[in-house]
UniProtKB/Swiss-Prot annotation:
InterPro entries referenced in this protein's UniProt entry, alphabetically: EF-G-like_DII (IPR053905), EFG_II (IPR041095), EFG_III (IPR009022), EFG_III/V (IPR035647), EFG_IV (IPR047872), EFG_V (IPR035649), EFG_V-like (IPR000640), G_TR_CS (IPR031157)
Entry GO MF terms: GTP binding; GTPase activity; translation elongation factor activity
GO cellular component: cytoplasm
Name of this protein: Elongation factor G
SUPFAM superfamilies given in the database record: EF-G C-terminal domain-like, P-loop containing nucleoside triphosphate hydrolases, Ribosomal protein S5 domain 2-like, Translation proteins
Name of the gene this protein is made from: fusA
Record's function text: Catalyzes the GTP-dependent ribosomal translocation step during translation elongation. During this step, the ribosome changes from the pre-translocational (PRE) to the post-translocational (POST) state as the newly formed A-site-bound peptidyl-tRNA and P-site-bound deacylated tRNA move to the P and E sites, respectively. Catalyzes the coordinated movement of the two tRNA molecules, the mRNA and conformational changes in the ribosome.
Family: Belongs to the TRAFAC class translation factor GTPase superfamily. Classic translation factor GTPase family. EF-G/EF-2 subfamily.
PROSITE patterns: G_TR_1, G_TR_2
């Protein structure tokens, strides 16, 4: 007998908490769990005791790495929270959680406003069409500036963000907030850990400013809502309910972003922000239908949240749990699923049995017998399912689009210390690459050396740490290497001819290919322009395949060749001696022959680097960036410090943390985000080729 769902769909919220590292995201999540009754003692990230940060590495580093899914209850709503990491090395976790969320809370540091990683996650949320509210946190800190933070949303993100509250005081005097919709003040009692506050009329000294700001709020809503605009221009009274309904509609349409103020650490303002989550963020019924594909016909199928429809869910995270083993986090889009039943993994076309279903709460769990549309839960027993796989009713297979996985930019070699470590390391790498698609491991067949690659130094440090802690692998780690790429800068035509005719069956393949540079990020494209069968149909896929295989090893220094178009336009064949293998080799020869004419260059990853430093060290810091081949993009003031925005090649950033610490006496900080690939200067290209024993394409 099927269970009934506990919370109706319109009372369900699936939200993520997104932020730059150190904006106070984990503390904010903690407080949500505390006030919604899930935690009895508050944990602080900087003391290494937070409910959400449940992996050992996170406890040590005080940063959130794995998006733990947690269920909480606020008033009569269920809120599922996906805790997303704020560190740039873990953007796959953020992308992954944005895929399964319906709405998000963006947390800003009131001193800093919008920071580089805020820009990153904001852009990702735009890509996935996720409505957001903003929580300006750390209002208790010296230098906190609510208005400047709101302004940074306009200036740096071009967002129509407007305060729905104004803070009462700031830094030491921050004591609560004024609600600009209902025009009341919520003032906190210092002694009651934020669980008690008084709602009072707006104090006289704030009345004039509050009315001015309420008017600004109405004007901002009127810009995106015709009904409010008509009333506003006509001088009619706008009721609180009308204003809230208009804000909800505009927020769901991504035209408006309500902004709240508070201090999670000092337990102020979190409950009002939770009211914002239920008032303005979408339920699964409010979001656009999720588009899936029928694997048989390729037709698009729209998935509406409905328990009666066939089951369809996305596996968005695999975790290795110390208590239950392999845990698959799923988001149910439609239908329902009982524990013990079978599902079809439509991505791999294999049947899997769901043993148990768990509702997750940071690192504790409750077993449940059934999940419904809109739910987020952990499933045990799915052996072959990996991140991004579609799980569906066996009678109704559907493919939900998979996640876009960025390529790694950095790699290091790992050498196990003993034969026993080698075996353990193989198991560890298999599990870790399953969990995280941006982490790759490969063994060089010639040298036997294992290389791991990822999104940054911190990313790889943490993976090595996990191998040691979870799998007892002792290994030596090499120097970090940059993931260079190669590309063509000019058009070139080249012949590739492979002939072996010495008794017996020979080999014959002959092709003419035109290579042209492709747009950045477009990758490799193949065009078949053969007329009159000069290269027979059956050999054309081999030419394409031969090119792709040859491109993996590049033409200059063995790095993958990217962003190139290849047009096969002529060639010849031999009735007897031509084969798929011969045409594969011919294609690779054409690529090699084109290299010198096509202006082959080595590309290097360029990082967007933001350095924050006290003014007295500014000269040293700027000098150091220039010395690292950096280009300045601009500078701004922030809370008594200078913030330098620049672009620097990744190869020049190794060891920068130590340099910055010593040149600013530990007071400077920096963040870096991969931005684009760019050709290396000639002298550096020559060095790279020399080191790799490649050939110069002069």
């Amino acid at each position: 007998m099927a269970n009934k769902r506990e919370f109706p769909l319109d009372k369900t919220r699936n939200i993520g908490i997104m932020a730059h590292i150190d904006a106070g995201k984990t503390t904010t999540t903690e407080r949500i769990l505390y006030y919604t009754g899930k935690i009895h003692k508050i944990g602080e990230t900087h003391e290494g005791d937070s409910q959400m940060d449940w992996m050992e590495e996170e406890k040590e580093r005080g940063i959130t790495i794995t998006s733990a899914a947690t269920t909480a209850q606020w008033k009569d709503y269920r809120i599922n929270i996906i805790d997303t990491p704020g560190h740039v090395d873990f953007t796959i976790e953020v992308e992954r959680s944005l895929r399964v969320l319906d709405g998000a809370v963006t947390v800003l540091d009131a001193q800093a406003g919008v920071e580089p990683q805020t820009e990153n996650v904001w852009r990702q949320a735009e890509t996935y069409g996720v409505p957001r509210i903003v929580f300006v946190n750390k209002m208790d800190k010296i230098g906190a500036d609510f208005d400047k933070s709101v302004k940074s949303l306009h200036e740096r993100l071009n967002a129509n963000a407007q305060a729905v509250q104004m803070p009462i005081g700031s830094a030491d005097t921050f004591e609560g907030v004024i609600d600009l919709i209902n025009m009341v003040a919520d003032v906190y009692d210092e002694d009651k850990l934020g669980s008690k506050w008084d709602t009072i009329p707006v104090p006289d000294e704030y009345k004039e400013e509050a009315l001015k700001r309420r008017n600004e709020l109405i004007e901002a809503v009127a810009d995106v809502d015709d009904g409010i605009m008509d009333k506003y221009l006509g001088g009619e009274e706008i009721s609180n309910d009308e204003l809230k309904a208009a804000i909800r509609k505009a927020t769901l349409n991504l035209e408006f972003f309500p902004v709240y103020a508070g201090s999670a650490f000092k337990n102020k303002g979190v409950q009002m922000m939770l009211d914002g989550v239920v008032d303005y963020l979408p339920s699964p019924l409010d979001v656009k239908p999720y588009v899936a594909h029928d694997p048989k016909t390729g037709d698009e199928v729209e998935l509406m949240a409905d328990d009666k429809k066939p089951f369809a869910a996305l596996a968005f995270k695999i975790a290795t749990d110390p208590f239950v083993g392999r845990l698959t986090f799923i988001r149910v889009y439609t239908g329902s699923l009982q524990s013990g039943s079978y599902v079809l993994n439509a991505s791999k076309n294999s049947r899997e049995r769901v043993g148990r279903l768990l509702q997750m709460h940071a690192n504790s769990r409750t077993e449940i017998s059934e999940v419904f549309s809109g739910d987020i839960a952990g499933a045990i027993g799915l052996k072959n399912t990996t991140t991004g796989d579609s799980l569906t009713d066996p009678a109704h297979p559907l493919i939900l689009e998979s996640l876009q996985v960025p390529d790694p930019v950095i790699q290091v070699s790992v050498e196990p210390k003993s034969k026993a470590d080698r075996d353990k390391m193989d198991v560890a790498l298999q599990k870790l690459t399953e969990e995280d698609p941006t982490f790759r491991a490969e063994t060089n067949p010639e040298t036997g050396q294992t290389l791991i690659s990822g999104m940054g130094e911190l990313h790889l440090d943490i993976m090595v740490e996990r191998m040691k802690r979870e799998f007892n692998v002792e290994a030596t780690i090499g120097e970090p290497q940059v993931a260079y790429r190669e590309t063509f800068t000019k058009e070139a035509k080249a012949q590739g001819k492979f002939v072996r005719q010495s008794g017996g069956k020979g080999q014959y393949g002959d092709v003419w290919i035109e290579f042209t540079p492709n747009e950045e990020g477009k990758g490799y494209e193949f065009e078949d322009a053969i007329v009159g069968g000069v290269v027979p149909r059956e050999f054309i896929p081999s030419v394409d395949q031969g090119l792709q295989e040859a491109m993996k090893n590049g033409v200059l220094a063995g790095y993958p060749l990217i962003d190139v178009k290849a047009k096969l336009y002529d060639g010849s064949y031999h009735e007897v001696d031509s084969s798929e293998a011969a045409f594969k080799v011919a294609a690779s020869l054409a690529l090699r022959n084109a290299a010198s004419k096509a202006g082959a260059v080595i590309l290097e990853p360029i990082m967007k680097v933001q350095v924050t430093t006290p003014e007295e060290y500014l000269g040293d810091v700027m000098g150091s960036i220039t010395a690292r081949r950096g280009s300045m993009e601009g500078m701004e003031d922030r809370a008594g410090a200078k913030v330098i925005n620049s672009f620097v090649p990744l190869s020049e950033m190794f060891g920068y943390a130590t340099t910055l610490r010593s040149s600013t006496q530990g007071r400077g900080t920096f963040t870096m985000v991969f931005d684009h690939y760019s050709p290396t200067p000639k002298s550096i290209q020559a060095d790279i080729i020399k080191k790799r024993g490649g050939e110069d394409a002069e």
